[in-house]
Amino acid sequence: MNIVEIAKNLIKCQSLSPYDAGCNKIIIKCLHNMGFYVEKMKFGKTENIWAYKGTGYTLLFAGHTDVVHAGNVKNWKYPPFSSKLKDGILYGRGSADMKGALAAMLIAAKKFFKSYKEPKGRLAFLITSDEEGSGSNGTKKVINVLLKRKEKIDCCLIGEPTGEKNIGDIVKNGRRGSLSVKIIIYGKQNHVAYAENNNNPIYHSNKIIGELLKTSWNDVQCILPKTTMQIIGIRSNIKKFTNITPSKVEIIINFRFNFKSNKKIIKEKIVSILKKYKYFYDIKCILHSDPFFTKTGNLLKSVIESVKIYQKITPCIINSGGTSDGRFIYKISKQIIELGLLNKTIHKDNEHIKVKDLLILCNIYQYILKKILIKN
């Protein structure tokens, strides 16, 4: 199969997270045909692939087969899983995020091993069907298995869609950490007609939120963007009635933080605000990921060089955006770069990619393989 055929076949699989829906069969067949050792790791409903070929210095290609829901299919030009190719544009859910990049990786590997029978290093693949969802049974668990085996991964290229206007104009070498916080403010349930006696936790929560919004969490940008806070939800324990006040209110918050913050620092700031108002409260913090950052190394140099050659531009290193599976891979590899297709239609109606972009990305990946596994 050529790169377009692989991409089309992957897009046709309705792999809503965490279901693989047949993507792995396509990928495994391609890998076996190249002589890769392939191991399937299934955790719960999630299907993962760990595969490699060669020995020594290891470059990992990482990605995911799962996709988000297509939404209202009436808003699509073509059915979201029909994999429609029209005028050089390939439509379909997951085309940009990130089945197109997976096809580019596979063809880049095929061309590389056709040219170099015995490279100096090892190429590995880690593919999961649980990246868009919770991520609990995906890359995270595979990495834990690899750590127990004492596997070594020297550098990792993740095919997340990073491009804004052109392939390679943006690459990422780090991400902020993610922390979710639930604050529970307690009051006293009462009849709404007796407002003067109300200990209403909604009013208490308003004061707390006001303080949170005024708080400086971290004004230092350092090597990653500033720490930010977003309030995700406010809900009371009253669901149906309209004549009673609630006894508690939950405030749900998410923080994206850089190396100048951490779970302990953020929690201490919140607690100091809660103590100031002397309300009864509980606070629960869930750390989803710590920040990570790749310093200059052979992978970043190779990525920049390849983009300059094939795109005639110098990529910008911008580490904004959400989390990626790099948060798990960082435990085993300190060189992680994200480089993929354009992100302007990801998770949207009519997600699509240009075939010419697929070919460019494949050439870039192939050049990186040569630089890392031949000239390293």
From Swiss-Prot:
It is an enzyme of class 3 (hydrolase). It comes from the Bacteria. The active site is at 66, 131 (proton acceptor). The keyword Nucleotidyltransferase does not apply. Its EC number is 3.5.1.18. GO terms for molecular function: acetylornithine deacetylase activity; cobalt ion binding; succinyl-diaminopimelate desuccinylase activity; zinc ion binding. InterPro entries: ArgE/DapE_CS, Bact_exopeptidase_dim_dom, DapE_proteobac, Peptidase_M20, Peptidase_M20_dimer, Peptidase_M20A. Catalyzes the hydrolysis of N-succinyl-L,L-diaminopimelic acid (SDAP), forming succinate and LL-2,6-diaminopimelate (DAP), an intermediate involved in the bacterial biosynthesis of lysine and meso-diaminopimelic acid, an essential component of bacterial cell walls. This is Succinyl-diaminopimelate desuccinylase. It comes from Wigglesworthia glossinidia brevipalpis.
